[in-house]
């Protein structure tokens, strides 16, 4: 059984957390502001520089919402202080990425280049033609955008070509053997 919900969340200096009676959370920090509607079933208490999430009962639904609510708040606090980053790598001959204004242009072996417009609150950096950094304060948006880029050309198991996360290990397969 997970006990993540029981852990308190430290509020760093320079971060302001406001939660109204309907559990609408607003977290302001040095990198920006995040807003999110949290579960109305949970009771969120802010005492000095610590946030505690309390569940009303021990039924299964409340136990799962307890950990979720605590993690969402923790991600918001970490996002406005440190931010989030996903690194993607392009593996394959002729696979390239470059930036044109707010568009990411990918050449992934198709007959046409793929243009992707950066979502609001996300910055994309292309330090080299085979590296992409997706940065932002909202963990969910950063992860979703990185997953969309990876989905365009997933790594294949025979040669490992495609778009992969920097820390991802691709399980390789052995090709067919001739007679």
UniProtKB/Swiss-Prot annotation:
This protein binds to the 23S rRNA, and is important in its secondary structure. It is located near the subunit interface in the base of the L7/L12 stalk, and near the tRNA binding site of the peptidyltransferase center. SUPFAM superfamilies: Ribosomal protein L6. GO terms for cellular component: cytosolic large ribosomal subunit. The keyword ATP-binding does not apply. The gene is rplF. This is Large ribosomal subunit protein uL6. GO terms for biological process: cytoplasmic translation. Gene3D superfamilies: Ribosomal protein L6, alpha-beta domain. NCBIfam families: L6_bact. Pfam families: Ribosomal_L6 (PF00347). Belongs to the universal ribosomal protein uL6 family. InterPro entries: Ribosomal_uL6-like (IPR000702), Ribosomal_uL6-like_a/b-dom_sf (IPR036789), Ribosomal_uL6_a/b-dom (IPR020040), Ribosomal_uL6_bac-type (IPR019906), Ribosomal_uL6_CS (IPR002358). Keywords: Ribonucleoprotein, Ribosomal protein, RNA-binding, rRNA-binding. The keyword DNA damage does not apply. The lineage of its organism: Bacteria, Bacillati, Bacillota, Clostridia, Peptostreptococcales. GO terms for molecular function: rRNA binding; structural constituent of ribosome. Part of the 50S ribosomal subunit. It comes from Alkaliphilus oremlandii (strain OhILAs) (Clostridium oremlandii (strain OhILAs)). Disulfide bonds: none annotated.
